[in-house]
């Protein structure tokens, strides 16, 4: 950026005249003053005050004497002073002129190098200002990109996701309630089915008992019919016997009538037989009526019992058919409820799978958006750091430029001072004793205080202290 040269080979005229300047060095390729960088680039930081003390030693003669600046060497160069009316020492003037020309040549070279360095600094400052403007435009562009829009989109998407999650949660809760209701209905139907099965078993048991009663009644009826037949046979037999007896009695009566006719003194047997017949007929009629009444009562009882059993059997069969129809309807309803439950469970699993996939997709979108936001924040922070670093560099360069400007102004004033002194010099011849007595050294200490705040020069103060040696 600037040409480097060794400080041991070249010594600045400023150093040779004013001594070492505190805080900076002109011998380095990029001679920049050493400033504390703390506080630059930080908004609201405390102001920093930089003080520089320049020691200027000037050798002044008597009235109208030649004043030369003090060199940084151990010895002090004392220029001879010429009084009025004395002879001019041309060899000394020639030496002074040669030294002045050499000094001017070195100063010209150093000023050219300083100009080159300042040109490079100006180019660098211009380049940094361009970069600073580009970064400022980039920062403004990033600020104008509406970062809140991303937050709004994020919040809107989050609200939509929350709404969908709430809808799915409500649907799942409703499906759970329906499933619980179906499970309760299924349990109730199962309990009712068990009750109906128990009732059917009781009806079947009653039917079996009724069947046993019917069988017993049938057997009793058959027995009674058999007994009726036997009684009818017995009645027929008794009738036959009775008829035989009647015939026998009639035959006997006829024989007795014959004997009566033969013997009128014998008792009347016809009346006795008639009485006996009447008695037997009465007894037979009574037995027949009693047998018929008993048979009729037994037949009516058996008929009533059979009718009751038939009614009970018919009612049991009807109830069994109703129970069978109810069982079939309940079985169909249970199958339908099982199918509905299976479809609801399948829908619930599908909803859960879809909800899980959508939730994972939303989580991926959220992670991607958060990663983009983090990336944008990191990029913005990086641009801000670069902008801050460039701003710090610019402030430091502004301070260095201001310092070099002050140094150049001081150097120009120092260069112009010997020319004016040399032009106003009255050459006169003096003796070495007079020159030695008139030469005295005047030391000037310049204290310059520069106060900067946030990289800008706020105030400057310069104090000079004169000391005669």
UniProtKB/Swiss-Prot annotation:
Protein name as annotated: Desmin
Start and end residues of each stretch annotated as Coil 1B: 151-251
GO biological process: one example: skeletal muscle organ development
Cellular component terms per the entry's GO annotation: cardiac myofibril; cell tip; cell-cell junction; contractile muscle fiber; cytoplasm; cytoskeleton; fascia adherens; gap junction
Region (Coil 1A): 109-140
Record region (Head): 2-108
Principal subcellular localisation of the protein: cytoplasm
Positions of region (Tail): 412-469
GO MF, any single term: structural constituent of cytoskeleton
Residue ranges, annotated region (Linker 2): 287-294
Subunit structure, as described in the record: Homomer. Interacts with DST. Interacts with MTM1. Interacts with EPPK1; interaction is dependent of higher-order structure of intermediate filament. Interacts with CRYAB. Interacts with NEB (via nebulin repeats 160-164). Interacts (via rod region) with NEBL (via nebulin repeats 1-5). Interacts with PKP1. Interacts with FLII.
Residues covered by region (Linker 1): 141-150
Phosphoserine: residues carrying this PTM: 7, 12, 25, 28, 31-32, 45, 60, 68, 81, 289, 357, 360, 423
Region (Interaction with NEB) residue spans: 267-414
């Amino acid at each position: 950026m600037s040409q480097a040269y060794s400080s041991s080979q070249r010594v600045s005229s400023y150093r040779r005249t004013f001594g070492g300047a505190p805080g900076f060095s002109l011998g380095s390729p990029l001679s920049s003053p050493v400033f504390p960088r703390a506080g630059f680039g930080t908004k609201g930081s405390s102001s920093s005050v930089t003080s520089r003390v320049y020691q200027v030693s000037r050798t002044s003669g008597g009235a109208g004497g030649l004043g030369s600046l003090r060199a940084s060497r151990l010895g002090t160069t004392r220029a001879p002073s010429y009084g009025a009316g004395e002879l001019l020492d041309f060899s000394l003037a020639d030496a002074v002129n040669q030294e002045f020309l050499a000094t001017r040549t070195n100063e010209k070279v150093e000023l050219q190098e300083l100009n080159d360095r300042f040109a490079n600094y100006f180019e660098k400052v211009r380049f940094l200002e361009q970069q600073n403007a580009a970064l400022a435009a980039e920062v403004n562009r990033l600020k104008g990109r509406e970062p809140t829009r991303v937050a709004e989109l994020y919040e809107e998407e989050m609200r939509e996701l929350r709404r969908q999650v709430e809808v799915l949660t409500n649907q799942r809760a409703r499906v759970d309630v329906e499933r619980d209701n179906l499970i309760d209905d299924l349990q109730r139907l199962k309990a009712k089915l068990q009750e109906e099965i128990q009732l059917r078993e009781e009806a079947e048991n009653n039917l079996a008992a009724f069947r046993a009663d019917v069988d017993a009644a049938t057997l009793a009826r058959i027995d009674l019919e058999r007994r009726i037949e036997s009684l009818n046979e017995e009645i027929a037999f008794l009738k036959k016997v009775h008829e035989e007896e009647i015939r026998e009695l009639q035959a006997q009566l006829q024989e007795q009538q014959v004997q009566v006719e033969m013997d009128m003194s014998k008792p009347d047997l016809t009346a006795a037989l008639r009485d006996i017949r009447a008695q037997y007929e009465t007894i037979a009629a009574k037995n027949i009526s009693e047998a018929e009444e008993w048979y009729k009562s037994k037949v009516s009882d058996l008929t009533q019992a059979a009718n009751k059993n038939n009614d009970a059997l018919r009612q049991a069969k009807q109830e069994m058919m109703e129970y069978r129809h109810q069982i079939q309807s309940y079985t169909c309803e249970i199958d339908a409820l099982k199918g509905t439950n299976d479809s609801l469970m399948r829908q619930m699993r599908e909803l859960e799978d879809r909800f899980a996939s959508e939730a994972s997709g939303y989580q991926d979108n959220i992670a991607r958006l958060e990663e983009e936001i983090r990336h944008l924040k990191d990029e913005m922070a990086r641009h801000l750091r670069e902008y801050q670093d460039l701003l710090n560099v610019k402030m430091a360069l502004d301070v260095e430029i201001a310092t070099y400007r002050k140094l150049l102004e001081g150097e120009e004033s120092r260069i112009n001072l010997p020319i004016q002194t040399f032009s106003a010099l009255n050459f006169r011849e003096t003796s070495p004793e007079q020159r030695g007595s008139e030469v005295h050294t005047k030391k000037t200490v310049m204290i310059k205080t520069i106060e900067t705040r946030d990289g800008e020069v706020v105030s400057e103060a310069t104090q000079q202290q004169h000391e005669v040696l």
